[in-house]
Amino acid sequence: MPRAFLVKKPCVSTCKRNWSELPDEERGEIYVPVSLGFCPPQPYQEPEPSVAEPPSCPLALDMSLRNSSYSVTPGPCVVAQLPSEDMSRLAGPQSRDHGFLRTKMKVTLGDGPSGDLFTCHICQKAFTYQRMLNRHMKCHNDVKRHLCTYCGKGFNDTFDLKRHVRTHTGVRPYKCSLCDKAFTQRCSLESHLKKIHGVQQKYAYKERRAKLYVCEECGCTSESQEGHVLHLKEHHPDSPLLRKTSKKVAVALQNTVTSLLQGAHHV
């Protein structure tokens, strides 16, 4: 017999609660789907001449407005509280028909202000910045803008596409200095150093690390954009990335020269 139990409560409106603020001993293992508050179907009854009170449940009110030929007597609204281990039962098609709304949101916290959170209206995941929400919303798009030229798989972000293409080309730019292993991502290398060699990273938490410019043609790495451009010109002159990168370097160089000329003019 499942441990689920019913508690009679009035219908509550959809609310957003940041569960990360509660300690573990107060958070518990209870998960309450708010939209589960529905009224059980009642048998048909003849309308009484007296003025009927407005339904206390919004679902019963909506049903009465859709079909005005008969009235529905609202029953007590019931909210179910289910343990976390019973969540797998809610993943079926029956649960999706009710449109459950999670009140236990997953919050992605950053170093931003402690103001209002930006919440995804599809999966209720919350973010501290609007740009983080905009990036997250791409994963819900049905149309994939960036396609892999090897297998045709689509992605919504160029970073994800670049990471996927390395599985076809075999490019592993992040090499371990203590063994012969190499990895396609920096995080995989850092995890390898920590678990296998016991090397702790020197940078602080969420500190921006030095960018590594990777040649996707041969896997050569450069610490500066200028060195990356020189490598492309020397070894891959027909690379489509060379034209785009050269424009960026030219604009940066022009801005530097302009600032130097303006400084000399003021002197």
From Swiss-Prot:
Gene3D superfamilies: Classic Zinc Finger (3.30.160.60). A zinc finger (C2H2-type) spans 118-140, 146-168, 174-197, 213-235. InterPro entries: Ovo-like, Znf_C2H2_sf, Znf_C2H2_type. One of its GO terms (cellular component) is nucleus. GO terms for molecular function: DNA-binding transcription factor activity, RNA polymerase II-specific; RNA polymerase II cis-regulatory region sequence-specific DNA binding; zinc ion binding. One of its GO terms (biological process) is epidermal cell differentiation. The keyword Repeat applies. Keywords: DNA-binding, Metal-binding, Nucleus, Repeat, Transcription, Transcription regulation, Zinc, Zinc-finger. It is found in: Nucleus. Putative transcription factor. Involved in hair formation and spermatogenesis. May function in the differentiation and/or maintenance of the urogenital system. This is Putative transcription factor Ovo-like 1. The gene is OVOL1.
